[in-house]
Amino acid sequence: MHGLDNEKRIFFYEQEFYAFSNFSSFKLNWRGHDWMTSEHAYHSEKFDDPDLLAQLKNTRSAHDAMKLAYANKNKYRADWDAIKLDVMKKILHAKVAQHPYVKKKLLESSDKELIENSWRDDFWGWGSNQDGANHLGKLWMEVRDEVCANEKQ
Protein backbone atom coordinates (compact mmCIF):
# COMPACT_ATOMS: atom_id res chain seq x y z
CA MET A 1 0.00 0.00 0.00
CA HIS A 2 2.98 2.32 -0.49
CA GLY A 3 1.67 3.70 -3.79
CA LEU A 4 1.99 7.36 -4.60
CA ASP A 5 -1.61 8.31 -3.75
CA ASN A 6 -1.26 10.49 -0.64
CA GLU A 7 -5.05 10.91 -0.51
CA LYS A 8 -5.14 7.37 0.86
CA ARG A 9 -2.49 7.99 3.53
CA ILE A 10 -2.22 9.74 6.83
CA PHE A 11 1.21 10.75 8.04
CA PHE A 12 0.73 11.05 11.75
CA TYR A 13 3.52 13.43 12.55
CA GLU A 14 1.23 16.02 10.99
CA GLN A 15 -0.77 18.01 13.52
CA GLU A 16 -4.25 16.77 12.63
CA PHE A 17 -3.33 13.18 13.47
CA TYR A 18 -0.45 13.76 15.87
CA ALA A 19 -2.53 11.96 18.52
CA PHE A 20 -1.22 8.71 17.00
CA SER A 21 2.35 9.62 17.92
CA ASN A 22 3.60 8.14 21.17
CA PHE A 23 5.12 11.54 21.87
CA SER A 24 1.70 13.23 21.89
CA SER A 25 0.57 14.60 25.24
CA PHE A 26 -2.01 12.01 26.21
CA LYS A 27 -1.47 10.64 29.70
CA LEU A 28 -1.92 6.93 30.04
CA ASN A 29 -2.85 4.78 32.98
CA TRP A 30 -0.94 1.59 32.30
CA ARG A 31 -0.81 -1.36 34.69
CA GLY A 32 -1.93 0.80 37.59
CA HIS A 33 0.56 3.61 36.98
CA ASP A 34 0.03 7.00 35.41
CA TRP A 35 2.48 7.77 32.61
CA MET A 36 2.95 11.12 30.92
CA THR A 37 2.69 9.60 27.41
CA SER A 38 2.27 6.25 25.70
CA GLU A 39 6.02 6.45 24.98
CA HIS A 40 6.67 6.43 28.73
CA ALA A 41 4.33 3.46 29.21
CA TYR A 42 5.99 1.54 26.37
CA HIS A 43 9.48 1.98 27.80
CA SER A 44 8.26 1.01 31.27
CA GLU A 45 7.61 -2.49 29.94
CA LYS A 46 11.29 -2.97 29.12
CA PHE A 47 12.47 -3.03 32.72
CA ASP A 48 11.93 -4.78 36.04
CA ASP A 49 14.28 -2.48 37.99
CA PRO A 50 12.15 -0.32 40.36
CA ASP A 51 14.77 2.45 40.49
CA LEU A 52 14.90 2.67 36.71
CA LEU A 53 11.09 2.69 36.52
CA ALA A 54 11.00 5.57 39.01
CA GLN A 55 13.52 7.50 36.90
CA LEU A 56 11.45 6.81 33.81
CA LYS A 57 8.28 8.01 35.52
CA ASN A 58 10.02 11.28 36.40
CA THR A 59 11.35 12.07 32.93
CA ARG A 60 9.95 15.35 31.66
CA SER A 61 9.17 14.34 28.09
CA ALA A 62 8.64 11.37 25.82
CA HIS A 63 12.02 12.11 24.25
CA ASP A 64 13.71 11.96 27.67
CA ALA A 65 11.94 8.67 28.41
CA MET A 66 13.25 7.25 25.14
CA LYS A 67 16.80 8.46 25.85
CA LEU A 68 16.74 6.93 29.34
CA ALA A 69 15.53 3.60 27.97
CA TYR A 70 18.17 3.52 25.23
CA ALA A 71 20.89 4.40 27.74
CA ASN A 72 19.89 1.28 29.69
CA LYS A 73 19.57 -1.22 26.84
CA ASN A 74 21.68 -3.67 28.81
CA LYS A 75 18.83 -3.90 31.37
CA TYR A 76 16.00 -4.74 28.94
CA ARG A 77 13.94 -7.82 29.68
CA ALA A 78 15.40 -10.89 28.00
CA ASP A 79 12.22 -11.42 25.98
CA TRP A 80 11.82 -7.80 24.90
CA ASP A 81 12.30 -8.28 21.15
CA ALA A 82 9.77 -11.11 21.16
CA ILE A 83 7.03 -9.12 22.93
CA LYS A 84 7.52 -5.48 21.98
CA LEU A 85 4.96 -5.41 19.15
CA ASP A 86 2.31 -7.01 21.35
CA VAL A 87 3.11 -4.58 24.17
CA MET A 88 2.77 -1.61 21.83
CA LYS A 89 -0.56 -2.84 20.47
CA LYS A 90 -1.97 -3.19 23.99
CA ILE A 91 -0.77 0.31 24.84
CA LEU A 92 -2.45 1.70 21.71
CA HIS A 93 -5.71 -0.01 22.71
CA ALA A 94 -5.39 1.56 26.17
CA LYS A 95 -4.79 4.98 24.64
CA VAL A 96 -7.94 4.67 22.53
CA ALA A 97 -9.98 3.43 25.50
CA GLN A 98 -8.82 6.26 27.76
CA HIS A 99 -9.01 9.15 25.31
CA PRO A 100 -12.22 9.71 23.29
CA TYR A 101 -10.39 12.21 21.07
CA VAL A 102 -7.84 9.57 20.02
CA LYS A 103 -10.66 7.13 19.27
CA LYS A 104 -12.46 9.81 17.24
CA LYS A 105 -9.33 10.53 15.18
CA LEU A 106 -8.74 6.82 14.66
CA LEU A 107 -12.27 6.32 13.35
CA GLU A 108 -11.90 9.44 11.16
CA SER A 109 -8.86 7.85 9.54
CA SER A 110 -11.31 5.48 7.86
CA ASP A 111 -9.48 2.99 5.64
CA LYS A 112 -6.43 5.14 5.00
CA GLU A 113 -2.93 3.82 5.43
CA LEU A 114 -1.43 5.18 8.64
CA ILE A 115 2.25 6.02 8.43
CA GLU A 116 4.60 7.12 11.15
CA ASN A 117 6.49 9.63 9.05
CA SER A 118 9.74 9.35 10.96
CA TRP A 119 12.86 9.67 8.88
CA ARG A 120 14.94 8.43 11.85
CA ASP A 121 13.13 5.17 12.49
CA ASP A 122 12.67 2.44 9.92
CA PHE A 123 11.26 -0.06 12.41
CA TRP A 124 8.34 1.90 13.92
CA GLY A 125 8.18 4.38 11.03
CA TRP A 126 8.99 4.27 7.37
CA GLY A 127 12.48 5.74 7.69
CA SER A 128 14.54 8.09 5.59
CA ASN A 129 14.05 6.10 2.38
CA GLN A 130 10.31 5.54 2.94
CA ASP A 131 10.83 1.80 2.84
CA GLY A 132 10.81 1.04 6.56
CA ALA A 133 8.56 -1.44 8.34
CA ASN A 134 6.12 1.20 9.68
CA HIS A 135 5.17 -1.11 12.54
CA LEU A 136 3.51 1.69 14.52
CA GLY A 137 1.31 2.60 11.58
CA LYS A 138 0.43 -1.05 10.99
CA LEU A 139 -0.46 -1.54 14.65
CA TRP A 140 -2.69 1.54 14.59
CA MET A 141 -4.48 0.10 11.54
CA GLU A 142 -4.98 -3.21 13.37
CA VAL A 143 -6.34 -1.38 16.41
CA ARG A 144 -8.63 0.66 14.13
CA ASP A 145 -9.99 -2.53 12.55
CA GLU A 146 -10.63 -4.03 15.99
CA VAL A 147 -12.29 -0.86 17.31
CA CYS A 148 -14.51 -0.68 14.20
CA ALA A 149 -15.47 -4.34 14.59
CA ASN A 150 -16.40 -3.75 18.24
CA GLU A 151 -18.44 -0.66 17.30
CA LYS A 152 -20.53 -2.79 14.92
CA GLN A 153 -21.41 -5.35 17.61
Could you tell me what each predicted segment is?
Residues 1-153:
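Charged, low-complexity intrinsically disordered segments
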